[in-house]
Amino acid sequence: PTFHERSAELTAADISRIDIASATRELIRTSFTSTASTEEIESAKELILQAVEILQSSNGGPGSAASESHFSDRSPFYGAMNPLSMPMSMERDDSIGEFGAVVGIATFTEPYEGPPGHVHGGFIAAAFDEVLGMAQSLTGRPGMTGRLTVTYRAPTPLYQPIRYCGWVDRVEGRKIFTKGTAHNGETLCAEVEGLFLSMPAELMDLLRKGRDLSTPPGEALTGVIEKGRES
């Protein structure tokens, strides 16, 4: 499986993490829009702090559970275990381009608002990065973002399904050039061109196996990154 593909079935613990992420996602949205009284907000805060204490009481270490999960679980855009994700739905469309395309559907809510009633441009760009990142991995030589150029064509509304589409335009050595669009119905909201740099397989393996949120990358990992830049 690629970096973006799950290689194992969901466990009971995985499903519980998906459920708590969904509940937390709703909490984020509701706390952002609620008109509850000060007393009610204080009561809710105490319950939240109790939940945090329960989760921390048996914590295996900073970031330990996240380190064990797959990127498809913890992605900030389509990861079902990540409360910050929309989450986007992702599908492959083999009818587009040499390697196929990735289509993502996202519905942005108030926490993602920029202009009144519309999505902040930074989130639009970040969602493009996620879709193009998955699209470039279809080459079998996945890399990391080198450049992302977004052109905004029309305001992107909240609470509407936004259709992202990303595909590989061409490959030149270790450079993977990508393109993409974002539509609200028939309206083109934004388009993008991205450059990804294919990285050595050993670097991707180290990133997967050696990831530890509690400590910075070690010298061995830094050396592999430098090797990737030189190749």
Predicted regions and their residues:
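Residues located in well-ordered beta-strands
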Residues: 89, 149-151, 163-167, 181, ...
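A conserved, well-ordered hydrophobic junction motif at loop->secondary-structure transitions
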Residues: 103-127, 134-137
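Hydrophobic beta-strand-centered segment that forms part of the acyl-chain substrate-binding groove
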Residues: 1-8, 130-163
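Intrinsic-disorder/low-complexity, polar/charged segments enriched in Ser/Thr/Lys/Arg/Asp/Glu/Gln
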Residues: 99-103, 147, 161-163, 177, ...
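Long amphipathic N-terminal alpha/beta scaffold segment
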Residues: 41-113
